[in-house]
Design a protein with these regions (language model features):
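N-terminal beta-strand motif that seeds the catalytic metal site of vicinal oxygen chelate
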Residues: 1-20, 29-32, 90-95, 144-150
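Vicinal oxygen chelate
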Residues: 2, 33-35, 65-69, 78, ...
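Exposed loop/turn and edge beta-strand positions of beta-sandwich/beta-sheet ligand-binding modules
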Residues: 5, 50-51, 89, 124
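Core segments of cupin and vicinal oxygen chelate
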Residues: 12-63, 102, 109, 128
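A short, acidic/glycine-rich surface segment
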Residues: 38-44, 75-81, 148-149
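Amide-forming acyltransferase catalytic core, primarily the GNAT-like/NAT-type
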Residues: 56, 73-74
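Short glycine/proline- and charge-enriched loop/turn segments
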Residues: 84-87
Length: 150
């Protein structure tokens, strides 16, 4: 009895294709997708008349997953502006990468920008927040500890 493992983070999006392409472009792998609806789905969500598309993507090592969800019903008419990085609640995910600067350049070429600036932190990580589709914030982290030691 008790927790076995961390399974996934759910992310609600308006454009499932764009969100999926963004995360696949960062190295996630598509695991599968489906449409969900019905009484059980309504009860789980605490909403009536739910119909949603779900796409699961996972890290290459299979230890982390994102559940990308596009709700077709019911409508959500309350749309806040993209939240700043310090707004309380789940705000970003972090993925470890190689060659962070090249990834940032590619993301900029694809129309995405950083929230702040690339910074080396405590000679251990090179870090940056990137704003993806629909204002999602993804932190990129490159381990530079071994780079600094050589």
């Amino acid at each position: 009895m008790g927790m076995l493992r961390f399974d996934h983070v759910g992310v609600v999006v308006d454009d499932l294709g764009a969100a999926s392409a963004f995360f696949v472009g960062l190295g996630f792998e598509r695991e599968g997708g489906t449409t969900v609806e019905g009484e059980a789905v309504d009860k789980i969500n605490g909403l009536a008349g739910v119909r949603a598309e779900v796409m699961m993507v996972r890290t290459p090592d299979g230890t982390g997953k994102l559940e990308l969800v596009k709700y077709h019903a019911p409508a959500d008419d309350e749309r806040p502006q993209p939240w700043p990085a310090n707004r309380p609640g789940f705000r970003h995910i972090c993925i470890e990468v190689e060659d962070l600067n090249a990834i940032v350049d590619r993301l900029r070429d694809d129309g995405f920008d950083t929230v702040g600036e690339v910074q080396d932190y405590a000679d251990v990580y090179r870090l940056v927040y990137v704003r993806g589709p629909e204002g999602l914030i993804v932190e990129l982290a490159e381990n530079i500890a071994s780079e600094e030691a050589s």
